[in-house]
Amino acid sequence: MQAPPRKPDVSGGPFRITSIETQKHDKSRVNIYLDGVFAFGLPRDVVIQQHLSEGDEISEDLIADVLLLDELSRAKEKALAYLSYRSRSIQEIDVKLKKKGFSDRTIQQVVDDFIRVGLLDDRAFASAYVQTRMIQKPMSKRLLKKELYLKGIPETMAGKVIDEIYEDRTELDVAVSLAERRFSGKVNIKEQKIRKKISDFLARRGFSWEIISEVLMNINSK
């Protein structure tokens, strides 16, 4: 786990802001000097928002507030970067930010803000996840529910989303289609060895023995 940035020792005060300098490697952040000594870095937006200027006095309470705003800003940047690869569930964002060392309070604020603006939506995430799965790696409803559960999606929500994506297809339809696509062109698909491979393959995709046996009977009747 990555340790959170060390909090500066700014107990006591009030302090005088003696310098605000743009950071060399990140123009969106500035270094704050109190009484001639470097104290901490902040996003430029926070400095503007809090009307901080050189020569101002700053209290211990205000320092605590701006450091919380800084943590929130950094947490949102991490979350946005994580979301840039693909959509995420609320639980995935929570776990990722915890690993980065952010506080529960900050993580909850990020989640609340992202939900409010539509960047986090567990139902939309679940729907996109299931659609992608059914295109790239079709599987049983049970296995889909398990995968969504591991990503923090409630069982009821997962069930509704999966039923919507499955539409008029049954699990048997999906299993038969999978078996035919995977094992088409085999010399003798009725051969015991091939039938065992079909059974194992469908079991790995989460299908029940009842479904698998129906698939095998379907193949046997052809």
Q: Where in the sequence are the language-model features?
A:
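An alpha-helical, amphipathic repeat domain used for nucleic-acid recognition
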Residues: M1-K222
